[in-house]
């Protein structure tokens, strides 16, 4: 099943956390639709800001949004003008108090969403797909990835028949739950049609922390 299921959902509660943290006794559908509108608005507004993940927490009439981005300066703006304008627009969209927290992604080459978007942009610029995937995998491995797998599917290089191709480096153990596998799927809009890009990145194993047991004192002789 590890080969079929989404690796992010497979590891929820093990080494990954939920991106939406709230509970609703009633009006669940309305709250979920509001989440989707928030995510769509942020993805369109910050399309060039290398945004990977948007986490949403709710408490009463307040929404806390954490935006994970590789370009925090672009999101915040000079003197915080951009992020304040974004906060006001989201407050108007939801009719609730919105607080925005910006989280910087230190190593964007280890983030599957950002790696996939980088490959998709190169495909849209008519760069050969093998070259784009090879360069992306090499950068990820140099940044410290234990393994990476990239799948491209569609009319590759403008071929008449659609096909799939994979490029893999290192180890990507999808069945190992303690392995920190990041997964993302991105689409590239080319002149020949849509090309799907799937990225799996193995960032190493996350082992449970062992509690230090109190050391036994040696018993005295006399």
UniProtKB/Swiss-Prot annotation:
GO terms for molecular function: mRNA binding; rRNA binding; structural constituent of ribosome. Residues 38-106 form the KH type-2 domain. SMART domains: KH. InterPro entries: KH_dom, KH_dom-like_a/b, KH_dom_type_2, KH_sf_prok-type, Ribosomal_S3_C_sf, Ribosomal_uS3_bac-typ, Ribosomal_uS3_C, Ribosomal_uS3_CS. CDD domains: KH-II_30S_S3 (cd02412). The keyword rRNA-binding applies. One of its GO terms (cellular component) is cytosolic small ribosomal subunit. GO terms for biological process: translation. Keywords: Ribonucleoprotein, Ribosomal protein, RNA-binding, rRNA-binding. Transmembrane segments: none annotated. Binds the lower part of the 30S subunit head. Binds mRNA in the 70S ribosome, positioning it for translation. Belongs to the universal ribosomal protein uS3 family. Part of the 30S ribosomal subunit. Forms a tight complex with proteins S10 and S14. This is Small ribosomal subunit protein uS3. It comes from Lactobacillus johnsonii (strain CNCM I-12250 / La1 / NCC 533).
